[in-house]
Amino acid sequence: MKIIIDPYRGGDDYGAKIGDKYEKDILLDLSNYMNNSFNNQNINSILTRNTDESLTDEDRVNQINKLKQDNDLI
């Protein structure tokens, strides 16, 4: 089994601003933390993005469909 983590937002899609941080940065930081935590426990996980890039909804769905198997969690 693999866990697919989708931080959403990114690139030109900043999301809400909370204090001095944008939602896209908070989501990426949280997703990286989750991914590292899972991997440190030998739980297979992968991110749909690990840099500040923008994905369309179609690109995101295509990438998830390419990565996932029948028993994966998204």
Where are these regions (language model features)?
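Catalytic-core regions of hydrolytic enzymes
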Residues: 2-74
